[in-house]
Each structure stands twice: as structure tokens, then as C-alpha cells.
Amino acid sequence: GKLLQEAEISCEIVCGRDFGGASEIRTIVPAEAQEITKEGLYTCLIRNDSPKKRELSQSISDDAFIRGKVPMTKEEIRHVSLGKLHLTEDAVFYDIGSGTGSIAVAAAQLSPNIQVYAMERKAAALELMQQNIEKFHLKNVAVVAGEAPDSMQQLPAPTHAFVGGSGGNLKQILEVVWQKNPLARVAINAISLETIA
């Protein structure tokens, strides 16, 4: 009751106790639940007729992520990059140089059936990425610590890959991706022409 009241959720609770007795079932509101002092086994159904609606968008605002000093792919770039990848329901997706994990999180939220491998070599980024994955309650993201392409060797073949950071190993990373799956679709973000040279 206290948790529901603090969350300011407007709901009713159908509460069952002493089945077979005169007061076996009653309907209460969260504030009344705090007043129940009788110990015993209760069965409750919480009914919320005005739940918060889940947004149907792959776009997550930058403010939603835990940031720190780790680089992050900005919202507009995430949106375009994931759109160009054309992820599918059963995709195996590599996020290489994941940083805060913003791309990994956005991809994983599209479908619980997408398996995301978020690769990062920097300890501070790995910690921040894990916090963001937990914040968004994602079960389909595996954090892979280490330098790509070495960290990719034991992973299943990707159907899609995003390269946000390559540590100077872009050519070798792409070779491993396409060795594992010659048809893998890849998106690369570059802030300098040297990246694609």
C-alpha cells in the first residue's frame, strides 16, 4: 500500500483473506492497505484503470541515460543509425565501442527477441553501460569487456553491427564481422574522415 501511495498510482486493491469467512474479500485503496494490521496470508489483485502508457518509439531522450564523462551517441544519430540498420525481430546485434550503451539500449528496447552484444574496452564506460542496461531493465543485452576485434571472436555471428568506436581497429573489426556473416548489415559513425580512409 505504501509503495503504491508513494508512487501516486490511482488504483484499487481487491484483497482476499480468511477465505470462507464473512470478510474474505474486500476492495480498498492504497491508503487503506497501510491500516491493515491483522497478520496472515493475503491474496491481492491491484487494478489500475489509468496505467501510464508506454511510448512506441525507438527514440530515447539523451536525458534518460546515466552519462558521466563517457561519450554517448546522441539521440538524433541513434535514431538515424538504427533506422539505417533495419534491425529484425531475431537480430544478433553487435554494438562495438558501446560507450554509455545508448545504442545497445535503444536496439534492445525494440524487441526482447533481439540479442545485443555491447562491446567496450574502457572500465568507466563498462560500468556506466551496465548501469544504463539495469536502468532500462533489459535482459537481452550482454556486456562484452575487451578490445574489438579480439572480444568478438567467441560471439555468435552478427546479423547487424554498429561501430561507434573502433580504437583504430576498424579494418580488422569489419573483417571479423564479415568473416562471421558476409551479409551482416553495418552502420559506422565517424567524426573524422580518417575513420573511413
What positions do the PLM features span?
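Conserved SAM-binding loop of SAM-dependent methyltransferases across substrates and taxa
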Residues: T100-P112
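S-adenosyl-L-methionine
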Residues: M119-P158
